[in-house]
Swiss-Prot record:
It comes from Methanococcus vannielii (strain ATCC 35089 / DSM 1224 / JCM 13029 / OCM 148 / SB). This is Glutamyl-tRNA reductase. Keywords: NADP, Oxidoreductase, Porphyrin biosynthesis. The active site is at C39 (nucleophile). Belongs to the glutamyl-tRNA reductase family. Substrate binds at T38, C39, N40, R41, S84, E89, N90, Q91, Q95. Pathway: Porphyrin-containing compound metabolism; protoporphyrin-IX biosynthesis; 5-aminolevulinate from L-glutamyl-tRNA(Glu): step 1/2. One of its GO terms (molecular function) is NADP binding. CDD domains: NAD_bind_Glutamyl_tRNA_reduct (cd05213). It catalyses: (S)-4-amino-5-oxopentanoate + tRNA(Glu) + NADP(+) = L-glutamyl-tRNA(Glu) + NADPH + H(+). Homodimer. The record marks H74 as: Important for activity.
Length: 379
């Protein structure tokens, strides 16, 4: 088991984006591998050592390489959201499933990788079912959505998201899980608004249509990187009752908006309390998750051992059958004028001699440790 990886803990997101693997080239080169790529991580999983990967990945020196038990435990932690930027987040599990299915469709999985990925998916599902590691928003974006849910309820509500950058994307991820009537995305660069709106199954609007979008919406979440105010008191005098959540830094909404009775304004300071409390709740679940991972890792090892034994038995039977056919053909050819008893006598001796010779030859060519750990008849 070998993993190459680069993630948000080592590189900023723009650098990670530049390091992305060309999946078509990668899958074309290797027979057994699975690639997991998200906005926060780039990882490739192999069931054996590889020597020429730098030919496929120009920035290979920037990747970390982990092997064996450490690599397997790393992947189980990834599937559980323990290695995510947002502790316990759900999205990574879906991304792992998609990566597995793509590799399987391309016939690039192996028995070991299938066991590993199916186990990781199972563990990720179990952890989220048996613990609270994914409950409560811990990012500012998800906390904003949680606050809107607490104050108004989001089911069948219209939400306007102003800003389609990094923070806006975090809000979008949190909104996906809610049963919202309509989501509108506004951004100065319309193409970015359009891309994010498609992900949300919502609609994008140009910035010059912002007033109409505000009138239509129940909740407005502001998350731009603008150096000046996007909304001022004069913009909101006649728009009806609204909840506005400003998570931009610097602020998108002039604080004088609080003077309007029809507007409830919340800022990033209001959200930090929610985010911090939820993070503490999730952190309390970490030891439980770690115990589940350790337990499931033990089960995985037994599954792999069973699979290995089954493969050994299959290979041994194939080897024996191959020897039997060859020695029987030789015995019949050399003993044409002999009785069946003589043919069987010669065949049985040759059969045993061939198997014994192969085993002894291999035994003398390797160390005692290698002999005990290897499958001699596959050599």
């Amino acid at each position: 088991m070998l993993v190459i990886k680069a993630d948000y803990k080592k590189y900023p997101l723009p650098v990670l984006e530049s390091m992305r693997i060309n999946e078509d080239e990668f899958y074309g080169k290797y027979d057994a591998c699975i690639i997991v790529q998200t906005c926060n991580r780039i990882e490739a999983y192999f069931d054996e050592e590889i020597n020429d990967i730098e030919k496929i990945i120009p920035d290979f020196k920037g990747f970390d390489v982990i092997k064996g038990k450490k690599a397997t435990l790393h992947f189980l932690n990834v599937a559980c959201g323990m290695d995510s930027m947002i502790l316990g987040e759900n999205q990574i599990l879906g991304q792992i499933k998609s990566s597995y299915h793509k590799s399987k469709e391309l016939k690039k999985t192996s028995k070991y990788l299938e066991n590993l990925f199916l186990k990781a998916i199972h563990v990720g599902q179990r952890v989220r079912a048996e613990t609270k590691i994914n409950e409560g928003g811990v990012s500012i974006g998800s906390a904003a959505v949680e606050l809107a849910e607490m104050k108004l309820g989001l089911k069948n509500r219209n939400v306007l998201l102003i800003g389609a950058g990094e923070i806006g994307t975090l809000v979008a991820k949190a909104l996906i899980e809610k049963h919202i009537k309509a989501v509108i995305v506004a951004n100065r660069t319309y193409e970015r608004a359009e891309t994010l709106a498609k992900e949300l199954k919502g609609m994008a609007v140009h910035f010059d249509k912002l007033k109409e979008a505000i009138n239509f919406s129940d909740v407005i979440i502001c998350a731009t990187s603008s150096p000046h105010y996007i909304l001022e008191k004069s913009d909101l005098l006649d728009v009806g009752n609204k909840i506005i959540i400003d998570i931009a830094n610097p602020r998108d909404v002039d604080d004088s908006v609080r003077e309007l009775e029809n507007i409830s304004l919340y800022t990033i300071d209001d959200l930090r309390n929610i985010s911090d409390k939820n993070l503490q709740k999730r952190l309390k679940e970490v030891p439980i998750v770690e115990n589940i991972i350790e337990e499931e890792y033990g089960i995985l090892l037994k599954q792999i051992e069973k699979t290995n034994v089954e493969e050994v038995i299959k290979d041994f039977n194939t080897y024996i059958e191959d020897v039997r056919k060859k020695e029987l053909e030789k015995a019949v050819r050399l003993c044409k004028n002999k009785s069946p008893d003589e043919i069987m006598e010669n065949f049985s001796k040759a059969f045993v001699k061939r198997i014994t010779h192969d085993f002894v030859s291999y035994s003398l060519s390797v160390s005692k440790e290698d002999l005990l750990n290897s499958i001699w008849w596959k050599k």
